[in-house]
């Protein structure tokens, strides 16, 4: 308990101490993307391309039907948060494709 005010009583009483900073537990890194995982996923995406439902969702996103695309993806993947993440991923892919097409011209 660090001394914040020169008082002997109350919530802030006690000696001045430096906080012992502990490094985060190993279990906290669950879900973080590693270089190898990213490489493997990119390789699979390159070989397999997109699933039919992803292609349909991309068509919906092309014509600015974002809400309809979200509802469609949610029906396919199960949860709202996963659907939002998938929609974001697909819209990033479309943006990259547009950027590549503009660069090519």
From Swiss-Prot:
Q: Where are the N6-acetyllysine modifications? A: 62
Localized where? Cytoplasm, Cytosol; Cytoplasm
One GO biological process term is: cytoplasmic translation
Establish whether keyword Cytoplasm is in the entry: yes
Name the keywords, alphabetized: Acetylation, Cytoplasm, Ribonucleoprotein, Ribosomal protein
GO CC, alphabetical: cytoplasm; cytosolic large ribosomal subunit; cytosolic ribosome; synapse
Per its UniProt record, what PROSITE patterns does this chain match?
Answer: RIBOSOMAL_L36E
* UniProt superkingdom: Eukaryota
A Pfam short name: Ribosomal_L36e
Q: Tell me a Gene Ontology molecular-function term this record carries.
A: structural constituent of ribosome
Q: How does it assemble?
A: Component of the large ribosomal subunit.
The record's similarity note reads:
Belongs to the eukaryotic ribosomal protein eL36 family.
Q: Name the job this protein performs.
A: Component of the large ribosomal subunit. The ribosome is a large ribonucleoprotein complex responsible for the synthesis of proteins in the cell.
Instruction: Name it.
Output: Large ribosomal subunit protein eL36
Tell me the organism: Rattus norvegicus (Rat)
The gene name reads Rpl36
């Amino acid at each position: 308990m660090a001394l914040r005010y020169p008082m002997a009583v109350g919530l802030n009483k006690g000696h001045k101490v430096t906080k012992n900073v502990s490094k985060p537990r190993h279990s906290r890194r669950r879900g973080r993307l590693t270089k190898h995982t990213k490489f493997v996923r990119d390789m699979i995406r390159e070989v397999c391309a997109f699933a039919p439902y992803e292609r349909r969702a991309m068509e919906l996103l092309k014509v600015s039907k974002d809400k309809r695309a979200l509802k469609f993806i949610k029906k396919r993947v199960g949860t709202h948060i996963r659907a939002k993440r998938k929609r974001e991923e697909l819209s990033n892919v479309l943006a990259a494709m547009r950027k590549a097409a503009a660069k090519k011209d």
